[in-house]
Each structure stands twice: as C-alpha cells, then as structure tokens.
Regions:
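Hydrophobic residues at beta-strand termini and immediately following loops
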Residues: 30, 58, 138, 165, ...
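Short beta-strand scaffold segments in enzyme catalytic cores
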Residues: 3, 15-19, 56-57, 152-154, ...
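CN hydrolase (nitrilase-like) catalytic-core segments centered on the catalytic cysteine
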Residues: 1-2, 74-172
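A short C-terminal boundary segment appended to hydrolase-like catalytic domains
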Residues: 177-181
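Active-site catalytic loop in hydrolytic enzyme cores
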Residues: 8-98, 102-103, 112, 116-119
Length: 181
C-alpha cells in the first residue's frame, strides 16, 4: 500500500496498492477510486488530494487479481460524494478471481463503530458472493486497544469467511486459496 505515492510518469499523487512479481518486477498499481469526502458541494477531503487511474487487473502466478482500497469496496454513504460504481463487480467482470482489499478505516468505541463494522462486513461478504470472487481484506491495527473497522482474513466466492484474524492488535494469518474449489 502506497498512500500519497507520487508516480514519476505523471507526477500525480495516488493512494494505491502496488503489484510486483515474486522476483520484484513492478506490474503496476490500483489507485483508490471511491475517495472519501464530505457530502457538501463541493466535497472536501481526500477526494481533493488523490488522483484516480483506470481500474485494472494483474496476472500474479497465472491468476487474475485486482485490488481495492477501503471505501472502494463498500462506498460508505456518509463519505462517498460520487456514485457507487460497484468496483468489486467490475473487477469480477474483468476476470479477477481474487481481490486484495487494503483498509485503513476509522474506528472508535462508540455504537456508531459497531454500525460501521456491520456495514463493512456485510458489504464485503455480499459483494464477494455477487461477483463470485475471493476477497482478502486487511485493516490496519492501530490503535491496538480498539477493534479494527472491518475483519481481516479471507472471504470465499460464496461470501463465507474461510479465515479470519483476531480483531484487535497486530495479527498475522495465512490461508491457501483453492481456486478449483
């Protein structure tokens, strides 16, 4: 994940996930598309600071994969001043079998954090099932004394959790995805 990475080719700042081969060859990047902003006119927030590049997929060890960043997947209605373009479905239509979902969600100890958690998790599972894709979401871990804003783990193409990390603190997990399943 490269937040505020300025690409040398165009000089623009992107919030991005970068893809490399196992040998370190750079394949390209996905930039956050549904950038957060206020619902005012004009909107204010990261929507004013980050550029967007076209949605694309990548070949990793012969598997078509894609990436989404945080709000790209769930299009939170409280901070998405543009239409929900259903990026999970678009990646599925482009042939993606696995989507890596990088999350840097806000969190707190309030009831509203519980509402956001439920919204994030249900969107994640429903969009994986609707697109028939595997989704690997990973949220940041700070502050470590609060539950993350969305579960981290692996959701299969039927929308079911097959691996899930503990919800507080820095965690590690691994899971072998069987695409023939």
């Amino acid at each position: 994940l490269g937040t505020c990475f300025v690409e040398p080719d165009d000089g623009k700042c992107y919030n991005q996930v970068r893809f490399y081969t196992a040998d370190g060859e750079y394949l390209g990047f996905h930039s956050k598309t549904l950038r957060c902003g206020s619902m005012t006119d004009p909107p204010k927030g990261e929507i004013n600071h980050y550029a967007v590049s076209p949605l694309r997929t990548f070949q990793v060890k012969g598997v078509t994969v894609g990436a989404l960043i945080c709000n790209d997947l769930w299009a939170n209605p409280g901070c998405t001043p543009m239409p929900d373009t259903h990026l999970t479905q678009q990646l599925s239509d482009m042939g993606a079998r696995v989507i890596f979902h990088a999350i840097n969600g806000g969190r707190g100890a309030s009831e509203w954090s519980d509402v956001a958690w439920n919204y994030h998790e249900s969107n994640l599972r429903m969009r994986a099932q609707a697109g028939g894709v595997w989704v690997v979401p990973v949220d940041n871990c700070h502050p470590t004394d609060l539950r993350c804003s969305c579960p981290s783990g692996v959701v299969d193409s039927r929308g079911q959790w097959v691996a899930q990390a503990p919800v507080k603190g820095e965690q590690f997990f691994s899971y072998t995805i069987d695409l023939d399943d």
